[in-house]
Amino acid sequence: MDFNILTLGCKVNQYESQAMREDLLKNGYFLSENKDKADITVINTCTVTSVSDAKNRKLIHRVRRQNPDGIIVLTGCMPQAFPGEMKELKECDIILGNKERSKLVPAIEAFLAHRSRLVDIPGYLNRGDMYENLTVSSFGEHTRAFIKIEDGCNRFCSYCIIPYARGRVRSKPLSALKTELENVALGGYREVVLVGINLSAYGSGEDYDLADAVETACSIEGIERVRLGSIEPEQMDKELISRLAAQEKLCPQFHLSLQSGCDKTLKAMNRHYDTREYAEIVGNLRAAFPNSSMTTDVMVGFAGESEEDFQASMAFVKQIGFAKVHVFPYSLRKGTRAESLPGHVSPAEKERRAKLMGELADNSRKEFLQSQVGLIEEVLFERLRHGYLEGYTKNYTPVHVTGGDSSLCGEVRRVRLTAAAGDYCEGVLSD
């Protein structure tokens, strides 16, 4: 039987979809050439916002409409967060929670044997859940591989449903991580990105931490670059930063989640830092990693955010000088503490604030790219498109080099950055 996997959401979901893909292939299933008519369609969902849920439902309806006789497997964060609702979703033949993805093949075989709808969404424990044994050995045709090392979150930000969808923090053992990284390196991947739901909590309750994971990744022969996924700022203490800075393979690019640049809003969000602490951590990272890039997420229009609060957030974002900012309006999430907070902002006002913050983010991006012009940087080329090579520097600046050929894809070359253009830098080969 053939299959197709549709993935919504974060890099962790992408990793888990790849793990399920490899599991299916290993057990005799094969990728569908006609994805709209696959015998089995796995939908790996995201539920970070209500907009995400709407996308999930729209995709389920489309798949069932296009392929009325196919088997639909629903998994990911949406069924885990809302098991009661999902059990009533009759369009799906198999529904698996986040803890059950490693049981995908047995679930499909059970369904085929009995042709009876299967729903398996066990809840999480307050503590004591084991890390799910998912692994990958490749990541399609990409030049970088995402490697999940952590799952779950203990933070319970007031706007966020993810702790309910992912459970408490648990971590991949270092021995398992080393084996997985060795297999990925054998597959020719020269860059890996370590990802997790709350990545900087890796090793919580264990005798290892994020620095140990980075040191393990950097020790693997064949892997030349190691990146970190999104990290929470307050867990980046000086000792951790010092250990990270000792690893030459670690790329100086940090996605340091902010959410708001206003202390009052951060407190209402139940974030675990204030703007002073955040700025200090950014300063420590920049001191340890010269020419590093800082990227972030900023939410506008959170419940109770006044115009004064918004302006404070704008001023702080400008002060930090991010390389890139993902701006998004607050979306009320059923089942979170923020649902009952007073002072919800109108959609029109959230849109206005998102536009203003977006303009600030665009200017910050332009300033960062311009700051890279004149530098000679190592670029890992990923593809040849429209007559130019595309790749990234270690600090994740996108670079376009006119000319060259596809033989350079997957190779690292020194490039002199000559101009900032749009969302990238132009450059010429330096050697």
Predicted regions and their residues:
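Proteins enriched for Cys/Gly/acidic motifs involved in redox and nucleic-acid/cofactor modification
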Residues: 1-201, 239, 254, 276-287, ...
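Radical SAM enzyme [4Fe-4S]-AdoMet core and its adjacent flexible, acidic
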Residues: 10, 203-218, 222, 269, ...
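Short glycine-enriched, charge-decorated loop/helix-capping segments at active-site entrances
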Residues: 47-48, 166-167, 267-273, 340-345
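Conserved SAM/AdoMet-binding glycine-rich loop
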Residues: 73, 81, 86, 186-307, ...
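Short flexible coil/turn linkers enriched for glycine and charged/polar residues
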Residues: 140-143, 153-154, 250, 260, ...
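Active-site proximal loops enriched in glycine and acidic residues that flank catalytic Cys/His/Asp
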Residues: 196, 230, 258-260, 296-300, ...
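Hydrophobic, well-ordered secondary-structure elements that form the walls
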Residues: 256, 297, 317, 325, ...
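Terminal RNA-binding accessory module
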Residues: 340-431
